[in-house]
């Protein structure tokens, strides 16, 4: 079966995502569309608004055929690590295409930029070092260096950045996957405004989550229904500020609670400790700690990894192949899974897999902890703390 891969978060699934899915099917003619989706925490360092099982259901009801999990360690990380994890999974699955949205909408341009990034010529390294010395954050320094060596005036907006990273890893891994891009329509990735049309960003939906009538027309009916069910059942919405007291507890009990954590350098733990007890919320704390070098999303990811007690470093992640776990599938997806089961070892039952495959224990332990921490903010949290072991992949028959 010819398979098209998409890399998603669906936080939550909105009309822009449906457009991306429909265009993917149209331009590839694929027999099946497989999604690699973030779990309960997302790339920008926030909890998903509802859990991964609800978002898997949204995906399947709207026409995705199989949903695979992007493990926490990759999902809540830099664009480079996020992209590596997702492309590694799609490589293992042997998909024919990866189709992603971008602000540029120009695959030739993105490929040209990715070539510089994939092979890091001396000229690129020289300018990167210069811009880092000037005090820019790593993402900004890299953006400036890429513009300098490529002589392209591309805007390094979130989806362009991820698209370049996907292509970079396709090049570095000598992958046979063909990258394709669809020009993003409607609002920018992090635009907080709902606007008057049917398209808006997931950010805008999350910021207006307490006024459900306002967001109804921005989401496909199936997605809106699932979101309503989750909220009415007390399993959402979950937000970053919900976890502020957990960080306060860690700061009170463990003075050096950040020192050994993921991505903490240059005395950053001291800045956190200096401001945490005078802050009224996580947003307040982050506004005090943020610097030119440490972006808001980077700080949020640091806090999330602290919350989950993740000490795994990027170098290890970039030399490790992530596990392949099925979150859900439809009838076409079932046929696809049957067609690859002889060559791809994928997880459907977590408990039995852990016992047989100890090499993935550290990644799976992080995933389990992340899911349990996410569940602590549900109304009846005690019912969901073991959900990782109880929940089998969701099956929804295809509407063919």
UniProtKB/Swiss-Prot annotation:
GO biological process: tRNA modification
Catalytic activity line of the entry: cytidine(34) in elongator tRNA(Met) + acetate + ATP = N(4)-acetylcytidine(34) in elongator tRNA(Met) + AMP + diphosphate
Binding of ATP, residues: 7-20, 101, 159, 184
GO cellular component: cytoplasm
Keyword Electron transport part of the UniProt annotation: no
EC number, as in UniProt: 6.3.4.-
InterPro entries hit by this protein: Rossmann-like_a/b/a_fold, tRNA(Met)_cyd_acetate_ligase
Presence of keyword tRNA-binding: yes
Entry's localization field: Cytoplasm
Keywords: ATP-binding, Cytoplasm, Ligase, Nucleotide-binding, RNA-binding, tRNA processing, tRNA-binding
An annotated Gene Ontology molecular function: tRNA binding
Main location: cytoplasm
Pfam families: HIGH_NTase1
Enzyme class: ligase
Function comment: Catalyzes the formation of N(4)-acetylcytidine (ac(4)C) at the wobble position of elongator tRNA(Met), using acetate and ATP as substrates. First activates an acetate ion to form acetyladenylate (Ac-AMP) and then transfers the acetyl group to tRNA to form ac(4)C34.
PANTHER family xref list: TRNA(MET) CYTIDINE ACETATE LIGASE
HAMAP family per record: TmcAL
Family note: Belongs to the TmcAL family.
Protein name: tRNA(Met) cytidine acetate ligase
Lineage: Bacteria, Bacillati, Bacillota, Bacillota incertae sedis, Caldicellulosiruptorales
Gene name in the database record: tmcAL
């Amino acid at each position: 079966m010819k398979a098209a891969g998409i890399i998603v978060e669906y936080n939550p699934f909105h009309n822009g995502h449906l457009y991306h899915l429909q265009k993917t099917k149209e331009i590839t003619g694929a027999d099946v569309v497989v999604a690699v989706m973030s779990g309960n925490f997302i790339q920008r360092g926030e909890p998903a608004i509802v859990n991964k099982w609800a978002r898997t259901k949204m995906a399947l009801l709207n026409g995705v055929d199989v949903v695979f999990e992007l493990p926490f360690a990759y999902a809540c990380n830099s664009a480079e690590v996020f992209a590596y994890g997702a492309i590694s999974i799609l490589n293992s699955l042997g998909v024919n295409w990866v189709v992603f949205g971008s602000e540029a909408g120009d695959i030739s341009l993105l490929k040209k930029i990715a070539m510089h990034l994939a092979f890091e010529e001396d000229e690129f390294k020289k300018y990167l070092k210069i811009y880092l010395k000037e005090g820019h954050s790593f993402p900004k320094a890299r953006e400036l260096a890429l513009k300098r060596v490529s002589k392209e005036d591309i805007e390094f907006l979130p989806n362009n950045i991820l698209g370049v990273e996907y292509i970079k890893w396709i090049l570095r891994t000598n992958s046979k996957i063909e990258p394709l891009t669809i020009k993003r329509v409607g609002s920018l990735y992090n635009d907080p405004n709902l606007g008057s049309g049917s398209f808006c960003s997931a950010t805008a939906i999350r910021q207006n989550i307490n006024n459900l009538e306002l967001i109804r027309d921005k989401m496909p009916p199936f997605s809106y229904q699932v979101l309503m069910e989750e909220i009415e059942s007390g399993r959402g919405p979950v937000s970053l500020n919900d976890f502020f007291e957990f960080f306060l507890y860690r700061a009170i009990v463990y003075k050096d609670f950040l020192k050994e954590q993921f991505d903490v350098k240059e005395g950053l733990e001291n800045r956190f400790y200096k401001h945490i007890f005078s802050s009224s919320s996580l947003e307040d704390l982050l506004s005090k700690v943020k610097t030119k070098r440490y972006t808001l999303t980077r700080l949020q990811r640091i806090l999330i990894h602290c919350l989950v007690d993740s000490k795994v470093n990027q170098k290890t992640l970039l030399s490790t192949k992530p596990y392949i776990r099925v979150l859900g599938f439809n009838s076409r997806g079932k046929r696809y899974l049957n067609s690859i089961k002889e060559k791809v070892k994928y997880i459907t039952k977590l408990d039995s897999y852990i016992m047989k495959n100890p090499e993935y224990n550290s990644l799976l332990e992080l995933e389990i902890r992340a899911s349990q921490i996410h569940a602590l903010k549900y109304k009846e949290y005690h019912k969901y703390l073991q959900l990782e072991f109880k929940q089998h992949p969701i099956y929804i028959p295809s509407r063919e």
